[in-house]
From Swiss-Prot:
Residue positions binding Mg(2+) 1: D64, D68
Keyword Transport attached: no
GO MF terms, alphabetically ordered: (2E,6E)-farnesyl diphosphate synthase activity; dimethylallyltranstransferase activity; geranylgeranyl diphosphate synthase activity; identical protein binding; metal ion binding
Result, substituting P15S: In MDHLO; uncertain significance; shows no change in farnesyltranstransferase activity
Species in which this protein is naturally found: Homo sapiens (Human)
Key words of the record: Acetylation, Congenital muscular dystrophy, Cytoplasm, Deafness, Disease variant, Isoprene biosynthesis, Lipid metabolism, Magnesium, Metal-binding, Transferase
SUBUNIT field: Homohexamer; trimer of homodimers.
Predominant cellular place of this UniProt entry's protein: cytoplasm
Name of the protein described by the UniProt record: Geranylgeranyl pyrophosphate synthase
GO biological process entries: farnesyl diphosphate biosynthetic process; geranyl diphosphate biosynthetic process; geranylgeranyl diphosphate biosynthetic process; isoprenoid biosynthetic process; isoprenoid metabolic process
CDD domains linked: Trans_IPPS_HT
Length: 300
């Protein structure tokens, strides 16, 4: 019977394991380790929390790629193009519950409550993002930021929230987490449409093909209400390179990339200020600095 159980587990987890072997940046793990500079969580608890966060993050990527109709993930074929959509959905959902099972081993009365709250946030944010895209409704910048805080903040909040359950450090880290959540997502949006590294790794400007309203496109749409070019391009779900190149050129012309870079610089400065106010954190500063290179080097 044992053997069969092992085989079943292997079959169920194969799409998930496929994703794990793709090269990733491990930003969430680095983030948890950096926050531990303040929180000083016992190593055994920290390892479980890092594992849970990585599991949920990677499982959500499997689902994301289906919802976004993506072709590539980190430069490799998406899991569902190899294993099929049904198996991948099941595998990702299975991993969510394995994550929950792991949270139970932390043996803290508030851990499951926190897990549930943050996963609800994650799905609310993701649901809004999909709703706007599929109903061709462009959110305002404020609406978009609120959604991002649910989506990226969901998993950031989970890792740090679980860590705080096992820490004597009780200062409110939410404002800093919010700044970092916005910084990460807007940086991703910028990279998808503007960075060399990204276009080699993801199919060129994939956010345009997906029809996604991202930070630069939202700026372009609201700053030029008389033009419907961007909406029309997003609506087409185009794979045409020339149309996508034209859209990037248009975003450059109307100042959307510059606006996005300035927003990122403001968020970066705000993060340093919030880190300083909590007594400093060299690891976290180094991580933010490293991630900021991308939108600075390009324009020097």
């Amino acid at each position: 019977m044992e053997k069969t159980q092992e085989t079943v587990q292997r079959i169920l987890l194969e799409p998930y394991k496929y994703l794990l072997q793709l090269p990733g940046k491990q930003v969430r793990t680095k983030l948890s380790q950096a926050f531990n500079h303040w929180l000083k969580v016992p190593e055994d608890k920290l390892q479980i929390i890092i594992e849970v966060t990585e599991m949920l993050h990677n499982a959500s990527l499997l689902i994301d790629d289906i919802e976004d109709n993506s072709k590539l993930r980190r430069g490799f074929p998406v899991a569902h193009s190899i294993y099929g959509i049904p198996s991948v959905i099941n595998s990702a959902n299975y991993v969510y519950f394995l994550g929950l099972e792991k949270v139970l081993t932390l043996d803290h009365p508030d851990a499951v409550k926190l897990f549930t709250r943050q996963l609800l946030e994650l799905h609310q944010g993701q649901g809004l993002d999909i709703y706007w895209r599929d109903n061709y409704t462009c959110p305002t910048e404020e609406e978009y930021k609120a959604m991002v805080l649910q989506k990226t903040g969901g998993l950031f909040g989970l890792a740090v929230g679980l860590m705080q359950l096992f820490s004597d450090y009780k200062e409110d880290l939410k404002p800093l987490l919010n700044t970092l959540g916005l910084f990460f997502q807007i940086r991703d949006d910028y990279a998808n449409l503007h960075s060399k590294e990204y276009s080699e790794n993801k199919s060129f400007c994939e956010d345009l093909t997906e029809g996604k309203f991202s930070f630069p496109t939202i700026h372009a749409i609201w700053s030029r209400p008389e033009s419907t070019q961007v909406q029309n391009i997003l609506r087409q779900r185009t794979e045409n390179i020339d149309i996508k190149k034209y859209c990037v050129h248009y975003l450059e012309d109307v100042g959307s990339f510059e606006y996005t870079r300035n927003t990122l610089k403001e968020l970066e400065a705000k993060a340093y200020k919030q880190i300083d106010a909590r007594g400093g954190n060299p690891e976290l500063v180094a991580l933010v600095k490293h991630l900021s290179k991308m939108f600075k080097e390009e324009n020097e």
